[in-house]
């Protein structure tokens, strides 16, 4: 499911990935795919 979350980018924080983003602070940037969506 991580792949799907990375694609959304915006959902990175809304989805379970938030746990990694909150701890690392860059869960969305962790994957090169969300680069265009994160911007």
Curated annotation (Swiss-Prot):
Tell me which domain of life the UniProt entry assigns to the organism this sequence originates from: Eukaryota
Question: Which residues does the record annotate as propeptide?
Answer: 1-8
What's the main place this protein lives? secreted
Q: Which UniProt keywords apply?
A: Disulfide bond, Hypotensive agent, Secreted, Toxin, Vasoactive, Vasodilator
Gene Ontology CC annotations of this record: extracellular region
Q: Does the keyword Disulfide bond apply?
A: yes
SMART domains recorded for this chain?
NAT_PEP (SM00183)
Q: Name one GO molecular function term.
A: hormone activity
UniProt xrefs under Pfam families: ANP
Q: Which InterPro entries match?
A: Natr_peptide, Natr_peptide_CS
Keyword Transcription regulation recorded: no
Disulfide pattern? 12-28
According to its UniProt entry, one GO biological process term is: regulation of blood pressure
Cellular compartments annotated: Secreted
Tissue specificity annotation? Expressed by the venom gland.
Protein's job:
Snake venom natriuretic peptide that targets both NPR1 and NPR2. Exhibits hypotensive and vasodepressor activities.
Report the family membership: Belongs to the natriuretic peptide family.
UniProt name for this protein: Natriuretic peptide NsNP-a
């Amino acid at each position: 499911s991580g792949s799907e979350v990375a694609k959304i980018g915006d959902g990175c924080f809304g989805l379970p990935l938030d746990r990694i983003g909150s701890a690392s602070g860059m869960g969305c940037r962790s994957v090169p795919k969300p680069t265009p969506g994160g911007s």
